[in-house]
């Protein structure tokens, strides 16, 4: 029943009636569910109608029924092909291909495979392609064998598989590294290693490479694949664990051995072949192998290094050429056989030398090739070995050390990466390190050298090079006994070794002279019988000469001389022998030959320090300092000698320090002296040189330390102490410097340089005293300086610096106007009026057109002193007329002295012109000195030559725009010419350069005054005074003047401290200007405000005397007016002093002088004088006269309220009822005109209390209560107002006193009197604390604050009160009281 359905289904498929075919197939399956063909037909029909899942199911059902049949497999394959299901194709294609193979359907098999390849290539990825290609390999079955010849060859298949795998590995590596490297704590190097290990661990590449090698059709492909396989093995070796490295190492070695054996030109293989073999010398490798490598890879770094090294002088020295091995071996052998006599032997030797020289490269080419090779391949141990050995050969020890260290690191990494351990090669680099350290910067690295020698000897106790090197290091370390033992071990194996010479030296150093001589004699026999370097024989002869010289036997000088000559015959370039010969000739006083020998020794070897020192001394004695410098620098630059401990010399550093010091290279000089002191810390000369270098470079503290150290090492060296004193002087420690110089003179009293320095120090000390206001001390110092200068000039009238210092001292004396009487006129005259001094002043120099000499004999006082200064500087100018360095300064000093003379006598304009000419002359000689231009500007300013002065200041600023003083002077010039804007800019620039320039600040104040900013000017002047510390006279004057103005006008709040500071300032000013009447007036007025009559009265008397003297000379009305003001001031001061009679007298004199004058100023003066006279008369009980004066004052003042109060007081004091009534009336009238006049209110209040007039008391109390706060504070009667209010309140209603005081304190919280009344009346601790806290937080007087602390009734507060006002006995009593109470309470408890 199924057959008809199958037949119908087949026919429907043929006509492509797929629906019918499906129907008939299903019908057939309904009769026979296991019918294979029905399932196949159903799968085909479903596939054709795109019902793929049903088709797949049908094919699978068919395969289950019969797996061996092909149709279902073929249909399923076509289904997967159409859906591009690569994964299923991978599974089914081998099966289908195998089915065709069994059926021997080769074409169908081939077509299936080809289609499979096309689909995979088109729709698959790299992994799919790899899997598809794998089907065509023998490992996958018989398909390749069946289709061989019709598919790709195996070589191609495997190569394509390799390309695909390598591509996949690269993509995986890049993606994984990028992904993992961003993880926290990841290191890129480790990430890359991990990913590479993952790739190579299960990689099929090894198998593929081997298959390519096996099936390769050409040698080129085989070699390329072998190279890849080697690279892979090397990677796996590096990445693998330690236990696995031997496996990969064996594989690599097998691979490269085959390559080398077959002479395959694979560079990596050959390189590993050489690099992995442990060896102690390049000669370990077969020459043919080395030559073959060079020929195979001529451009490689290793080939370059091997070729250069094998053709170097070092190689030929260690491996002498064999003639029979040369290219001309046959011919040379024949010549050798035929020529046996001595003459022919010489020709043979010359022929050998020619052959060697023809094959040898120059040293520079060898080094260049080796260096280039190493730079291109620094990981090559063989290149490092060649270059390190060659560095040692060239004595380039520093490079050898660095290279050997790097090579040892390479070997260490090689062992870590590959497990290859190269012990012999390691010892080669350790030996290079040891040798390098033995010779580089000796003895700095000798410890390291000994360390490596010990390592080498631990591995091989009989290592020749290690024993010899260790022995030499022990000799260098002066361990001669140990060196004897070490060299003895060496000589046990090498009896006739040249090291006998070193052994003899050890015997000599240990004192065994006979053994040393016998050993060196044996050494000479050995050396003369050997073909060794001439240097070795020369050294042995030299040492033999040294031993003979020290034995001092008969004819020892001649024998040692003969040995030294023999040394030079063997090696004419052996420098120590020349040094010894030089010493020999020097001892026999043949200095010409000695010098020649020393020169030759030093030319050959700069480490011959003894020869160098002898040469340096010789040239220094001949003043050939350039040659001394050359020798010293060469010694310094010789590394073999510079750091040797056994030769502790520092003369080269000292001499270079002196040379650099003279060349003004102070930093370099310091370095050299420090180096000298490191070598010899007790070298006094080096300490002195270091101190001088420090001093001349401005580092005075360091210089002082250095000189003090030198002084400790040599206390008797007065020159060091002189330098110390000079430093102390330069540092401003003048008193200490005076003490030091005096100590020197106590021992060496005739040293003129010390006396001159002491005189200069006294002058500087005087200037310091003058700046600090110690004028008497300044005069003392100047007297001593003048005395010393005169003493020096008596010894040497041409002492240049003495004349200069004497002139400077005289100029300083001119400023001490109160002490001119102490100037030693006679002492100066004894010097100046001598014939020798006159000759010095007029020694033939043509200065007549420039210099005007003042008349010393007719001068006196300041003029005489200035004239003496001019004469001193004139003589100084004459003495330095030929000195181009000192002459400009001398002209400047002379010009300054003439300017000082002009300041003392301004009537002599000629002196000012001479001063200008002198400064001009200084500028001609030194036009770039900004100080000279500044001084010329000052002088032109005095002559009103504004343009010239401006030009000079600008020129000075062009030379040095950072000079604050010049800017200040330029500002002063501008303000003198009313250019305020320019002056302000100049002063601002000056302050920006030097913020502590008080003169510039004073100039800023002038500018502020010029533009009307008085308050700002006062602030600036106060700041200028603070920064000047009272040292600037002009600032002192203006500070005191502004303070007096502030006190008189009450424009600014001032304290007693401010007034005391102003008083101090004006006193300092008067100390330098004792005849300034304006300053005396300011001083007396300030003291008047302070209530200090003790000092103010003498100042006012002196003021009157000076003004009287001026008036007698000039009879100027201005002076007369000032004299009257001075008398008025003196009268007030006498009144304050309670010297009433003197007060009346002085006021009377002034009033008499004012008769007939009517202007406003006269009226004010008359008013003050009448008040003074009236008040003084009042206290003298001359009430009538007092009343008369007050009435006159009342008339002059137009019934001024203050005057009315005074008149009322006098009327009341007269005692008559009429007088009292008149007083009341006067006060009422005054209050009508000025209702808030505090004085009138207080006076009338007192009268009302006396009269018990409650109505008036109430009215006065109300008026006082309504007074404005500013009016009370301005009047200065706060305390009186408060007391009056209390009295009036007590009179009216006593119970209101507390509220009154509280209200008063609310308005005036700082009123100490109110707090006192409140505290005394209502005592409490909280009130006392409030009192103290309030005063502490408000500006208050120390006395009031102390009182507040005192009332707190505690020990610590009482102590604070004492600290504030220690002179107040109340504070001490309070402390005593609280202390007593505390003791009593403690006893009671």
Swiss-Prot record:
Transmembrane segments: none annotated. Residues 326-355 are annotated as: Disordered. It is found in: Cytoplasm. GO terms for cellular component: cytosol; Ski complex. It holds the Pfam family TPR_22. SMART domains: TPR. Keywords: Cytoplasm, Repeat, TPR repeat. InterPro entries: Ski3/TTC37, TPR-like_helical_dom_sf, TPR_22, TPR_rpt. Its main location: cytoplasm. GO terms for biological process: nuclear-transcribed mRNA catabolic process; nuclear-transcribed mRNA catabolic process, 3'-5' exonucleolytic nonsense-mediated decay; nuclear-transcribed mRNA catabolic process, non-stop decay. The keyword Repeat applies. TPR repeats lie at residues 2-35, 36-69, 90-123, 381-414, 429-463, 465-497, 498-530, 538-574, 575-608, 650-683, 684-717, 719-751, 759-792, 931-963, 964-997, 999-1031, 1124-1157, 1167-1200. Component of the SKI complex involved in 3'-mRNA degradation pathway. Component of the SKI complex composed of at least ski2, ski3 and ski8. The SKI complex interacts with ski7, which makes the link between the SKI complex and the exosome in order to perform mRNA degradation. This is Superkiller protein 3. The gene is ski3.
